[in-house]
Each structure stands twice: as C-alpha cells, then as structure tokens.
C-alpha cells in the first residue's frame, strides 16, 4: 500500500513538473506570438490609417473633395468645413550635387468651394548657399482643370502646368491591404510611423509613373508610407507617400504624394 502511495506521489510530482514546464513554454510561445502580433498590428494600423484617404484614389475629379470630409479634431474652428491640401512632386538628379524638383500644390477650401495653389520649379543643391531659386506659378482649379494665373513665356512649361495631373487622380491602391512584410519603423515619442515595401515594375502605379515622368533607371522602386502624428488621425500631423526609384548619388529619383485634411486658414473660414 505504501509503495502504491509513493508511486502516486511520484507521478503527481512528475505531472506537476511537466505542467509547469509546459506552461513556461506556452508563455514563451505566447510572448513570441504577442510580439509578432504587435509588429503585424502596427503594419495593419499604418495601412488602415492610409486607407482612409487612399480608398478614395483615383480621384479623377478633384472637385469631388469639396463633398468629402476627413479627420476632424479640436483644431477646427466652429463652422469650418476644412481644407484639403494635395501635393505631387517629382525630383530627379541628372548630375551629382543637384536635384531638379517640380510639382504642384493645391488647397481645396470646402467653405468657399475654391481651389488655389501653385506649380513649383526648384533646383536643390548640396551646397545650401545656392538654394534660393525656387519659382512658383500661381494656379487655380476650375471645372476640374488647372488654370494658370501667371504669365509663363516658356510654352513647354506652360503646357506642362496646364496639363498637370496629381498622382491621386490616377493612382489605385485597392490592393493596399494585400501588401505584406513591410519594413516597419516607429517612433512613439514624435510620434511617427513608416512602412516600406519593395514594389515590382509590373505594379500598375509604378507603370503609370514611368509613363508620365522621365524615370531612366530600371530599378524597381521602394514604396514608403509615412505618418507624422497620431496614427489614428490628426489634423496637426501629415501622411506622405513616396516612391523612391534610386537613391544613388547623382541619380536620385523620387515621386512624393501628399493628401491631407486640416483646418482652413484665416480668411478661408466663413
């Protein structure tokens, strides 16, 4: 009888040791899974944050933004319907030390249903003492067409401005949720969040960019989704898309896109 009791006690202790060890392993696995989930969830949060605006792409008629409202917070004054800011810029280096940068900025005021902005032409030098040559040409949006308000004698430039299309007018991100294994960088103190994906030259957005811009490199680009501010939404921060085709010195080639909703400024508020 004593022998049976000893065997039973031994088995109980053995099972307890196995159970504790098993719990320890389970906890380790749970920690690993939780850590993985945190990384995955952060990537998903970044994509979901961008989806709030990217789901609207392509915005073929920019004036549709007058009827669309973005994220609102306490920064908005009473009665302010807000203003959409849209930017597309393309920069390319044709020789070391100099970057040619061109693009357009447009402010679509939902209070006045008026859109004004400018086309910019700039040369950015490594020697910062030379960086005082940006030219701006005022524009407005009428019937979904860019109207040039300044006199431009260069016919080629004039045509380029009047026929300009923002990236958001032809880009399509319906597959955004399927982007996987992004390189995620976060800084909770700023806060800022970044997801970077290696794209393929067969991607429809990449192909469209190659049709429109003088992209000479055959490199497939990296797509960067960058958030400055609260990942859940903020009128103070901003979100930026960037396609970097080359970062080699003297061959830098980048397309950047920006669409954000924020408070209207001064006289823009009714």
UniProtKB/Swiss-Prot annotation:
Signal peptide coordinates: 1-22
UniProt keyword Flavoprotein, yes or no: no
Primary localization class, coarse: membrane
InterPro entries cross-referenced by the UniProt entry: Csa (IPR007595), Csa_sf (IPR038641)
Keywords recorded for this protein, A-Z: Cell membrane, Lipoprotein, Membrane, Palmitate, Signal
Lipidation (S-diacylglycerol cysteine): 23
Membrane topology of the entry: Lipid-anchor
Cellular-component GO terms for this entry: plasma membrane
Keyword presence, NAD: no
Positions of N-palmitoyl cysteine lipidation: 23
Cited Pfam families: DUF576
Subcellular location: Cell membrane
Top-level taxonomic group: Bacteria
Family statement: Belongs to the staphylococcal tandem lipoprotein family.
Protein name in UniProt: Uncharacterized lipoprotein SAUSA300_0419
Organism phylogeny: Bacteria, Bacillati, Bacillota, Bacilli, Bacillales
């Amino acid at each position: 009888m004593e022998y049976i009791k000893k065997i039973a006690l031994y088995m109980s202790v053995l099972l307890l040791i196995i159970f504790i060890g098993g719990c320890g392993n389970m906890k380790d696995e749970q920690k690993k899974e939780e850590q993985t989930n945190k990384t995955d969830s952060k990537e998903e949060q970044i994509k979901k944050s961008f989806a709030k605006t990217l789901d609207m792409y392509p915005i073929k008629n920019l004036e549709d933004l007058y009827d669309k409202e973005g994220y609102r917070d306490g920064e908005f004054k009473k009665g302010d319907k807000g203003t959409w800011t849209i930017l597309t810029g393309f920069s390319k280096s044709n020789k070391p030390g100099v970057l040619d940068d061109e693009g357009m900025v447009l402010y679509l005021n939902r209070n006045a249903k008026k859109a004004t902005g400018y086309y910019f032409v700039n040369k950015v030098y490594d020697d910062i003492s030379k960086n005082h040559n940006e030219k701006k040409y005022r524009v407005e949006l009428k019937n979904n067409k860019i109207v040039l308000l300044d006199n431009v004698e260069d016919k080629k430039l004039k045509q380029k401005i009047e026929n300009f299309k923002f990236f958001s007018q032809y880009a399509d991100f319906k597959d955004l949720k399927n982007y996987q294994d992004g390189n995620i960088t976060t800084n909770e103190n700023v806060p800022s969040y970044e997801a970077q994906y290696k794209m393929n030259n067969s991607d429809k957005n990449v192909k469209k960019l190659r049709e429109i811009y003088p992209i000479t490199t055959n490199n497939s680009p990296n797509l960067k989704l960058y958030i400055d501010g609260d990942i859940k939404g903020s009128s103070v921060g901003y979100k930026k898309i960037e396609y970097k085709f080359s970062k080699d010195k003297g061959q830098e080639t980048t397309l950047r896109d920006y669409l954000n909703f924020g408070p209207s400024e001064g006289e823009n508020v009714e």
